[in-house]
């Protein structure tokens, strides 16, 4: 007993020493790992095999090719045997040779974060690509992170008011939700995205992050210039409201598969450290999956359905689960979705749909009527379109608007064949109100003032509900439908009608 007590006392005396020893060992191990050198043994397109004699870097660590300009970062994807890792290149591998020296950085890809990234364009590894000098910050974060714990998440369902009538009324966005933005070329996706960025900054004081994943370089350049014109990015002072992260179509698949995570990391900093409600735009989420499938084949994984990677659901889930509301702030994500060959059952879009809370569908038919934003009020949906979340009045008005628009749609064939005169009085009233509602769903955007000549309007949700409720009740049946076009709240309809009447007189 005495011997045991003495031994335990001796152990206690040893504890501080053991602690020092383990700390020094950990420091030495970290130093050795950070200083680990390897050499390239094989290059297969975007995949590079690197051999290390000791201190094999863990999976997802960033390696750097020595003496190469511009900087080439490799991300560890697999361990082959005892001393070789298979990595994915974040840039072109042209000119790499066997035996070339590679350094282990000791941690995953780290990028600059914080307010200094606003108004700037960075690439997948966090380097500025807008020719405006380095990003002056010492705050960095790793692009790979765990999703927030359950205890950190906020379970309250809350609307993110965008100030855009058609969105707030018929397919409202949930704070921390994920929205799919469907639309072809030229129907106004970019303008809608810019208006959302602008409104969130003005109404909530929040920041936005735009991740261009595998998009056209020309489109990325146009968006940047349009944001400068629209005042979303300011080159003169620090009032920019958006950070841009680009990995274009011409980039290797490694960069396109990781650039969405880079954008998400910038957004996570604003949410977790500054308590912001952040908007994260991803254009296009399909390219994230596409890049993953390109890399997967090179890594030697057996493809699954339609040639996609076997880890498709895991890759998508690990990214989407990080986009959520916590008790500190929220990330609301708007994701443009390309549907290959218009096949909604394709594994890539089908996997994305499982994560969406709302869909905003832009329709060419509505754009052709000159109604912008060209959001389809019957095709767009939202998970929070529930009276328990949005309130009974909002729910009733939204359903009333959709019903009258659906009735008008079913009457259009009769009108086309027989004309308006053949309709009953009740149907004529339905058509008149539906056309007024259709025009009242249009709205002048602040970022498009330069092109339209109309002053932009941000409409509070209460005024939106009040306006549509009054139109449904027939309070404005006496006003001409042209008065409802391109205005903000319902009071402006009355003003516009009075003005038109005076001009006509």
UniProtKB/Swiss-Prot annotation:
Enzyme type, top EC level: translocase
Record: transit peptide: 1-31
Residues where ATP binds: 183-190
Keyword Protease: no
Record flagged with keyword Membrane: yes
InterPro entries: AAA+_ATPase, ATP-synt_VA_C, ATP_synth_F1_bsu, ATPase_a/bsu_AS, ATPase_alpha/beta_chains, ATPase_F1/V1/A1_a/bsu_N, ATPase_F1/V1/A1_a/bsu_N_sf, ATPase_F1/V1/A1_a/bsu_nucl-bd
Domain of life: Eukaryota
An example Gene Ontology biological process: proton motive force-driven mitochondrial ATP synthesis
Catalytic activity reported: ATP + H2O + 4 H(+)(in) = ADP + phosphate + 5 H(+)(out)
Keywords: ATP synthesis, ATP-binding, CF(1), Hydrogen ion transport, Ion transport, Membrane, Mitochondrion, Mitochondrion inner membrane, Nucleotide-binding, Transit peptide, Translocase, Transport
GO cellular component, one term: proton-transporting ATP synthase complex
Localization (cell): Mitochondrion; Mitochondrion inner membrane
Ranges annotated as spanning the membrane: none
The EC number(s) this enzyme carries: 7.1.2.2
Single GO molecular function: proton-transporting ATP synthase activity, rotational mechanism
UniProt main location, coarse: mitochondrion
Assembly notes: F-type ATPases have 2 components, CF(1) - the catalytic core - and CF(0) - the membrane proton channel. CF(1) has five subunits: alpha(3), beta(3), gamma(1), delta(1), epsilon(1). CF(0) has three main subunits: a, b and c.
Protein family according to the UniProt entry: Belongs to the ATPase alpha/beta chains family.
HAMAP family reported in the protein's UniProt record: ATP_synth_beta_bact
Task performed by this protein: Mitochondrial membrane ATP synthase (F(1)F(0) ATP synthase or Complex V) produces ATP from ADP in the presence of a proton gradient across the membrane which is generated by electron transport complexes of the respiratory chain. F-type ATPases consist of two structural domains, F(1) - containing the extramembraneous catalytic core, and F(0) - containing the membrane proton channel, linked together by a central stalk and a peripheral stalk. During catalysis, ATP synthesis in the catalytic domain of F(1) is coupled via a rotary mechanism of the central stalk subunits to proton translocation.
Protein name: ATP synthase subunit beta, mitochondrial
Native organism: Drosophila melanogaster
Lineage: Eukaryota, Metazoa, Ecdysozoa, Arthropoda, Hexapoda
């Amino acid at each position: 007993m005495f011997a045991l007590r003495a031994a335990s006392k001796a152990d206690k005396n040893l504890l501080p020493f053991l602690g020092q020893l383990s700390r020094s060992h950990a420091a030495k191990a970290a130093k050795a790992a950070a200083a680990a050198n390897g050499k390239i043994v094989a290059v297969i397109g975007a995949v590079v095999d690197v051999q290390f004699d000791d201190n094999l870097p863990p999976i997802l660590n960033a390696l750097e090719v020595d003496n190469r300009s511009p900087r080439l970062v490799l991300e560890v994807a697999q361990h082959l045997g005892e001393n070789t890792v298979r990595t994915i290149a974040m840039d072109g591998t042209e000119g790499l040779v066997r035996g070339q020296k590679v350094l282990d950085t000791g941690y995953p890809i780290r990028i600059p974060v914080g307010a200094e990234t606003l108004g700037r364009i960075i690439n997948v590894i966090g380097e500025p690509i807008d020719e405006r000098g380095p990003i002056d910050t010492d705050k960095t974060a790793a692009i790979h992170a765990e999703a927030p714990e359950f205890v950190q998440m906020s379970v309250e369902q809350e609307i993110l008011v965008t100030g855009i009538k058609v969105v707030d009324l018929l397919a409202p966005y949930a704070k921390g939700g994920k929205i799919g933005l469907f639309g072809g070329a030229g129907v106004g996706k970019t303008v809608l995205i810019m208006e959302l960025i602008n409104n969130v900054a003005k109404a909530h004081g929040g920041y936005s992050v735009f991740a261009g994943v595998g998009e056209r370089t020309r489109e990325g350049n146009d968006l940047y210039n349009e944001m400068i014109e629209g005042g979303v990015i300011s080159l003169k002072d620090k009032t920019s409201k958006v950070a841009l992260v680009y990995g274009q179509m011409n980039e290797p698949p490694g960069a396109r598969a990781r650039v969405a995570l880079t954008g998400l990391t910038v957004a996570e900093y604003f949410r977790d450290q500054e308590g912001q409600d952040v908007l994260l735009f991803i254009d296009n989420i399909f390219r994230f999956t596409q890049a993953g499938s390109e890399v997967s084949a090179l890594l030697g994984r057996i493809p699954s359905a339609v040639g996609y990677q076997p880890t498709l659901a895991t890759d998508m889930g690990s990214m989407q689960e990080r986009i959520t509301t916590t008790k500190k702030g929220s990330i609301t994500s708007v994701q443009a979705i390309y549907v290959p060959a218009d096949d909604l059952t394709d594994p890539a879009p089908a996997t994305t749909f499982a994560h969406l809370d709302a869909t905003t569908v832009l329709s060419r038919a509505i754009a052709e009527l000159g109604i912008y934003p060209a959001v389809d009020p019957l095709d767009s949906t939202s998970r929070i379109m529930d009276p328990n979340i949005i309130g009974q009045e909002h729910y009733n008005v939204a359903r009333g608007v959709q019903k009258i628009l659906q009735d008008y749609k079913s009457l259009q064939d009769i009108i086309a064949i027989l004309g308006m005169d053949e309709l009953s009085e009740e149907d004529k009233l339905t058509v008149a109100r539906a056309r007024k509602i259709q025009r009242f769903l249009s709205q002048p955007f602040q970022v498009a003032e330069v092109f339209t000549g109309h002053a932009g309007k941000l409409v509070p949700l209460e005024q939106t509900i009040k306006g549509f409720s009054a139109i449904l009740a027939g309070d404005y049946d006496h006003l001409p439908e042209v008065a409802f076009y391109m205005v903000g709240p319902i009071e402006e309809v009355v003003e516009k009608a009075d003005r038109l009447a005076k001009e006509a007189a």
